[in-house]
Amino acid sequence: MALAGLCALFACCWGPAAVLATAAGDVDPSKELECKLKSITVSALPFLRENDLSIMHSPSASEPKLLFSVRNDFPGEMVVVDDLENTELPYFVLEISGNTEDIPLVRWRQQWLENGTLLFHIHHQDGAPSLPGQDPTEEPQHESAEEELRILHISVMGGMIALLLSILCLVMILYTRRRWCKRRRVPQPQKSASAEAANEIHYIPSVLIGGHGRESLRNARVQGHNSSGTLSIRETPILDGYEYDITDLRHHLQRECMNGGEDFASQVTRTLDSLQGCNEKSGMDLTPGSDNAKLSLMNKYKDNIIATSPVDSNHQQATLLSHTSSSQRKRINNKARAGSAFLNPEGDSSTEAENDPQLTFYTDPSRSRRRSRVGSPRSPVNKTTLTLISVTSCVIGLVCSSHVSCPLVVKITLHVPEHLIADGSRFILLEGSQLDASDWLNPAQVVLFSQQNSSGPWAMDLCARRLLDPCEHQCDPETGRREHRAAGECLCYEGYMKDPVHKHLCIRNEWGTNQGPWPYTIFQRGFDLVLGEQPSDKIFRFTYTLGEGMWLPLSKSFVIPPAELAINPSAKCKTDMTVMEDAVEVREELMTSSSFDSLEVLLDSFGPVRDCSKDNGGCSKNFRCISDRKLDSTGCVCPSGLSPMKDSSGCYDRHIGVDCSDGFNGGCEQLCLQQMAPFPEDPTLYNILMFCGCIEDYKLGVDGRSCQLVTETCPEGGDCGESREVPMNQTLFGEMFFGYNNQSKEVATGQVLKGTFRQNNFARGLDQQLPDGLVVASVPLENQCLEEISEPTPDPDFLTGMVNFSEVSGYPVLQHWKVRSVMYHIKLNQAAISQAFSNALHSLDGATSRADFVALLDQFGNHYIQEAVYGFEESCSIWYPNKQVQRRLWLEYEDISKGNSPSDESEERERDPKVLTFPEYIASLSDSGTKRMAAGVRMECQSKGRCPSSCPLCHVTSSPETPAEPVLLEVTRASPIYELVTNNQTQRLLQEATMSSLWCSGTGDVIEDWCRCDSTAFGADGLPTCAPLPQPVLRLSTVHEPSSNLVVLEWEHSEPPIGVQIVDYLIRQEKVTDRMDHSKVETETVLSFVDDIISGAKAPCAMPSQVPDKQLTTISLIIRCLEPDTIYMFTLWGVDNTGRRSRPSDVIVKTPCPVVDDVKAQEIADKIYNLFNGYTSGKEQQTAYNTLLDLGSPTLHRVLYHYNQHYESFGEFTWRCEDELGPRKAGLILSQLGDLSSWCNGLLQEPKISLRRGSLKYLGCRYSEIKPYGLDWSELSRDLRKTCEEQTLSVPYNDYGDSKDI
């Protein structure tokens, strides 16, 4: 029965739920479990337009700033995204989630505050008055109906499930209670008929009792109303001739009426069952021997039971029953009150005792049990109770489920341009809400506050404001408040410590058991060689993965796509690199890997690679077994000096013999033989010698690989096979067969091409036979002997370093003389690889190490010669102390060459002008010790080859040891050596090694136009060092000498096409205070050529004079604002795109003495004489005093010199000043004479000092910003014409004594 009721209840509740589910079937199932979500976009345009829109579009404001104050009174996060352009306006996106009734309560307002802050406040409808800018949310009607239907569906389903669970639990509890009651039932003793009659309790309603009886009951009830019963009918039990124990009666009442006996009725149905059982007892006799009285009483009792309203005592029929024993009635009344108290232990708070008739029921347990067995059903719950429970539970479930918790959450997303949010902006969020700055690429220093509610105080969140450097592990806000910091202090978990550089990051200081590092991840700051800059806000993560058992170090400071390198078949490495904006994410990934201080520790973490205790660790043949892990090692290594064979079956010396395991039989025509050769120093180790052999009746050819028949005979004069290869180092034009280094312009030591003499190859004028394939073209005699002499130029070695410049003599001068006789043009028509080069290439087939190919290039060079010129060459360099000496000697040489005799001394050495060369004339002056040969003139000569007899211009007599054959003068055409290789893989690897050797010093790979350096090619500063940075040589200008306040510096701009990109030059200027110790400097200034000089920022003290273009590579720089007679030191560095600096180049020079106008000084000396001559008035004295005081020390020296030179007979200048002006004024004037150095004082005593002015062109540039990484040096001259104008500067010079120019 119970199961049937549960099934009916389940069907009752499931039916409406199914109907609702069907009705709501059109609703999106994904939305059934979500709250209502509404998105609103709010633009800040109205307020920016009305107040200060100009901050967004002002051309003068490149990065406008705006203070924001954003406050959210609802729970929800705040997101800032700077994804807009600078011309776009900021806007807010509100994502409101909640139920239908709460969403319209969300309001917002924007306000422009007086301090220029844009306020955006999200608040409740009742939380703030209606202000301009407030906008409520609106809910469409169709969405509301759909929402109500969905909520009703969820409510019915939830209520049904809760009700079924509750009923199931209740039935189980009652079933357990019933079993407990059966075990506790006590059997009733057998009683007599009188005792059985005594158990019949006669119920007399109180309405049948007289007034006095009712009054006594009222008094008793008033005294103990707190313990009276609450039933609807009052009664007075009367015992019929038997003193029944009220205690036993109460126990029976408890078991029958409260617990229900065997019926195990629920608490809800207990009252109905008690009424049913007690009504059956109402038909019993009320008094002994009076059946009519019983019937009368029962009729009246039933009428009272059926009545629907309380019975008034004034309308009842009063029939009293007399009692003879008042004491007995009193006792029964007291007991009745006790029974009522037991039935209602909580008491009755009502005081209406008279108008509400009450009745207490006492039931016989034994009769109740009988009734239960006969008339009561077995089901624990009847139909009426089941219906009541079902309806009540369904109603409660509907009411409770209709109020599903759906909190109101408002998420704010602020979209702004980059750098718009100014430092000091405020964000006020509800406690528990966060500020999401993950998409805020350029965050500002903002102030964050949290509040418990919209009216609560604000608390500053010191940890949440760490936007620029968020803590990796933990943040302690209390530390920040205690130490008055702007943000909370970062803490680390156990086992970690703070990074010494990045205080907000944590590094591990305790490492557990190493589980292997693969993938092995490292991170550090790198250098972006693609963009040509060093990122300051990025950390590069480099992840190395295991290839086939071995890890190789790669470059870790470059930014390129993942590259895969194959060093040998058993060792590969692939690196995947990711650029991370956030260092914390890099650190978190790194924490999962292991830490290694060195490569050896990394390799040792894998444990022994082999067990070498038995069978040589499994290594074959002459391999050595090692247990320690090493780079490029699988545990089997070759002995020192040996290399693994192609099939890795053994080790051999690749420089000797062949490799029989290369898949081509070692290049042998018939047999490839192997022989074991033990090492003399260690007999346990041996080398595998492999060589070619021939079968019977065949012999090995001269090439060591081919085989020839032994019985084969060559006809007379015939050609039997290939002729023997002849070494070409002793052959005419033999350099054509050797390698060539096109950087050093030198011939390599290794012979690349094979030279044979099978053909009769002879050239005109040469008696020796030439190698095959060599074409020789002779040059006519009239074009063979040519003389060249250069213009005299300042010695470049004198202009750099410590320059001992003298304004008296000027620059020393250098002149070059050369005679060249080109006799033959040589061209190589056919090229055959020599045996030595072939063996070297064959030994490298399949090799993957770049170092092996670089060693081959060092031996054989990186190019081979195709065309060259041969002949004779003699050159001489002549140094002069100054330009005047060179000019005088050259004029004398021209007179002698024309037949003129300037002196007797020169007539003795006069020769035929056709054969007299300028070096011979200089040498004759030096040998004779003539006086015209000035001190400091010297000459050095050298020659290549022996001068032919047909050339009369040779100066140096060749020694007998000099060969008579022509020598190599110049290589006119050369080709890369890798073009001679036929194996595609070897050719590719050799080409990569050639490029690496030419541009990356052999320690890096060429990637387009830059070098990717190996891990070993980085300096202590972390910068790559594989690509050599050319050193610019700083020198004084060869055209413009230094003046008293100006110096012109110049250097050659040199930038290789691959590996190095020069982006700037740095010039440091220092003033030396100690002439003996140049390390003591007073001031120091560092200038950038790009940022300070060509931009015009340092004009007029630093200006460009000449910049590179497509024809010229010289850079000239004018340094002004210098002090006369002062030593300055200038240092130059070249800077490339990785931040490297070249080796410095210095120039130390002393500026000349102050320039003086000697003509003006002589005029002033005449004027002073006229003022001092005769009577000198006060006005004349003052005029003389003012004139002399304003001259300055250099001019005053020349005035003194000219005055004493012409007017000393009238009195010396010093004495005349003291006599005419007085000691005090004369002392002030004459004290200026001591301001100059002794060197300048001596120069100012020269009889003749002339003033000349030179013109110096320079570029007057307007200030402009030039990006160094976009600088094109070849187009720099054209680009500067847009912002610079060519102007002329007049520079004064003094010539002491005779003029320098003749």
From Swiss-Prot:
Keyword Cell membrane tagged: yes
Annotated membrane topology: Multi-pass membrane protein
InterPro entries: Annexin-like, ASTN1_2_Fn3, ASTN_1_2_N, Astrotactin, EGF-like_dom, FN3_sf, MACPF
Function: Neuronal adhesion molecule that is required for normal migration of young postmitotic neuroblasts along glial fibers, especially in the cerebellum. Required for normal rate of migration of granule cells during brain development and for normal cerebellum development.
Main location: membrane
Gene expressing this chain: Astn1
Residue list for modification Omega-N-methylarginine: R337
Subunit structure: Interacts with ASTN2; the interaction is not calcium-dependent.
Name of this protein: Astrotactin-1
